[in-house]
Amino acid sequence: GARRSVGYVPFNSETLVTGKLFEDIRDAVHELADPDHYDAVVVTNLCVPTASGVPLRLLPNEINGVRIIGIDVPGFGVPTHAEAKDILAGAMLNFARQEVEAGPVQSPKGGKNDRPTIAMLGEMFPADPMVIGAMLDPMGLAAGPVLPAREWRELYAALDCEAVAAIHPFYTCLLYTSPS
């Protein structure tokens, strides 16, 4: 679901002329980085970084304990909303993986499932995980987190899954059967 807070950095021609767009973005990120409200702040650049002059890699990785994730999603290179969400999921998983590699992290709220789990990546309707879970159950599998995740700890659970199911109208599957 799209129940996430969305902020933006207002800018005008003065910002562009003075070349302060990156500074304005950096200041806005510092303002937003309140650990009482956010686990992470994702900054999305919808332009090519070299053209926009917004080098998101120069933002800090963390401010006040809030993760800062910069992603470049150029509009002409990423044609659909779903694919942009895949880029977001990849950036979030990469950040979470680095945290896991650095040391202990919080356990997912529901704990670890006793069955192998399948992370689900892509466009999902609210009932989809339950229906998919019911289909996986006879195989001894369980539905894992949906990515992009609503809660940061779900990313750690996704990294612990046995496999990923790419659920997306643009993903296709080729089934291979060996000749008998």
Spans of model-derived segments:
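Metallocofactor- and cofactor-centric catalytic cores in central/energy metabolism, strongly enriched
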Residues: 3-36, 43-53, 58, 73-82
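Short, charged N-terminal beta->alpha structural module
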Residues: 5, 119-142
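A short, well-structured beta->alpha microelement
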Residues: 23-25, 140-157
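Structural motif
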Residues: 45-46, 120-126, 167-171
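Long, charge-dense
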Residues: 55-95, 99
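A short, charged/proline- and glycine-enriched loop
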Residues: 108-118
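Short, well-ordered secondary-structure micro-motifs within conserved domains or adaptor modules
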Residues: 154-171
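Conserved small/polar residues in nucleotide/adenosyl-binding loops
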Residues: 176-180
